[in-house]
UniProtKB/Swiss-Prot annotation:
Keyword annotations from UniProtKB, A to Z: Ribonucleoprotein, Ribosomal protein
Gene Ontology CC: ribonucleoprotein complex; ribosome
Protein name stated in the entry: Small ribosomal subunit protein uS10
InterPro entries in alphabetical order: Ribosomal_uS10 (IPR001848), Ribosomal_uS10_CS (IPR018268), Ribosomal_uS10_dom (IPR027486), Ribosomal_uS10_dom_sf (IPR036838)
Coiled coil stretches, renumbered: none
Annotated HAMAP family: Ribosomal_uS10
Organism: Clostridium novyi (strain NT)
Organism ancestry: Bacteria, Bacillati, Bacillota, Clostridia, Eubacteriales
Example GO BP: translation
Gene3D superfamilies, sorted: Ribosomal protein S10 domain (3.30.70.600)
Protein family according to the UniProt entry: Belongs to the universal ribosomal protein uS10 family.
Length: 102
């Protein structure tokens, strides 16, 4: 695994949990001797939903709700088998979605 890199994308609705998870991953990778680039904040997706407040009429009265998806990118350069093993055992919060590419 000398010339490979691991690219980790994290997604979450809460940016505090996301930053804590990214910090755990960076700390774990650095403890095993790998070089780390990141966490890089990626653009936040904003999903807006507009609904009518009334059930049958009054179309002018509407309400908008939004949900923001925060994203981070971490590159682990020259990972060792020890790094991969440590990352597989890492326990992260339930609200964080993780995508890993080799």
């Amino acid at each position: 695994m000398a010339n490979q890199k691991i690219r980790i994308r994290l997604k979450a609705f809460d940016h505090n949990i996301l930053d804590q998870s990214a910090e755990k991953i960076v700390e774990t990778a650095k403890n095993t001797g790998a070089k780390v680039a990141g966490p890089v904040p990626l653009p936040t997706e904003k999903d807006v939903v507009t609904i009518l407040r009334a059930t049958h009429k009054y179309k002018d009265s509407r309400e908008q709700f939004e949900i923001r998806t925060h994203k981070r990118l971490i590159d682990i350069l020259s990972p060792s088998p020890k790094t991969v093993d440590a990352l597989m055992r890492l326990d992260l919060p339930a609200g964080v979605d993780i995508e890993i590419k080799l």
